[in-house]
Structures are given as structure tokens and as C-alpha cells.
Amino acid sequence: MREATVYLLRIPGAGELPLSRRERERKAVESIIREVFGPEAALHHDDNGAPYLDGTATGTFISVSHSASTACVAVRNGSAVGVDIETGRSQLRSVAARFLSPDEQAIFTSDTALLTAWTSKEAAFKAASEPRLVISDIRLSSDMTSAATPSGQRFALFHHPIGDSSMITIAIPYA
């Protein structure tokens, strides 16, 4: 079964909550965690930076992402999940060679395709949780419905556009 639950929360602007952007993002994620798992749940990060929760059932996996305006937490029971949310920006075109293989660069040329490829690789990277994995080594299928790591892990990818310029991608391991 390939199920995950994704929670979104708008991040307050600096005028609404006078903290640094990073602090507003952190507070938004903590708010989601408290709402979903209760006040006893505590978010931590392992040595590789992957998030995990104390105070929840064993086997609960989470992934965290945020854009400038939205915090996102994906939750899955039983196996890993990866999530990424991004707002499209022109910089993706200038850094495409850093995250796409030459073959992928030839296929994914539009701004929307670059945004989808970026979020796909980020989500798969998070779900893989492999030490020393390099994002450019993750390979995407030409239709961006799956991703694979050099070690053989494979992921189903699910894309959800948000508004005109943002994308959420969820990566779930194939059984």
C-alpha cells in the first residue's frame, strides 16, 4: 500500500510574527506536529539530519519541508516517506546541471518540469535516507512517476501543484 498523509500550514509573514524566516518555519512545523500528534510529540533529527518523533507510535515516519509561505509534514506508518514543497523560481534553470543528469537535462526543459524534477529528487533523497547519496545520482523516469537511487531503492512519486507556481512531491518506497 502506498499511503501517506500530508499536512500543510501557511507560514506567517514577518509582519504577523516578528521572527526570522527560519524561526517562523520551525514554529509552523512544530504547530503541525503538536496538532497531529499531541503535545507529547517531540521533533528531533538523526545524525543524517532526517526528522523523527519521540512520543509517537513506533514505525511512524515523517518528512518535513517548507517553502517561503507553507510548511509541510508528510506522515507514513510502516516505511519511509519523503516530501518536498517548492515555489518555482528562475534559479532552477541555472542550477539544473547540479541536480539533473545530462539525459534528464535534455528531457526536463520547461520551468514546470524543472520544478517537478527538483521536488522529485528532493523527496526521493529524503525517503532514501542513504548516507553519501548525492541528489544528482537519483534517476527519474521520463514521466517523473518514479525515482531510483544507485543502491537500487525505488520510489513512487506523487506530484501536487499548489496555485500557479508551487509544487509538492511525495516519494514513497516501492515494496
What are the roles of these predicted feature ranges?
Residues 1-175:
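Core catalytic alpha/beta fold that binds nucleotide/phospho-ligands
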